[in-house]
Amino acid sequence: MFIFGGYVKGSKSNDLWKFDLNSMSWTCLGQGDKIETITSPNRPCQRIGSAMLCFNNAIYLFGGHDAFNEKLNDLWKFDLASNQWAKID
């Protein structure tokens, strides 16, 4: 199971978390184990209310609302093999 974004300590997040059903543990992907917001053109911005789909060893993330509650219309791909984000234009 994967979760992206949401609220952390009252602020919107751009963390991607994976839950392992076998070990019943969470892992933050692409950032190590820190909970902090990273702003970069190479990863999605902080958001809530986005949609996600897992397909062919990748996670696709679409839309949501950003830190200013503006609607987002962007599409991102997270490659599970390389732990890298790529924006899809």
Task: Go through each PLM region and give its residues.
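Kelch-like beta-propeller repeat domains
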Residues: 1-89
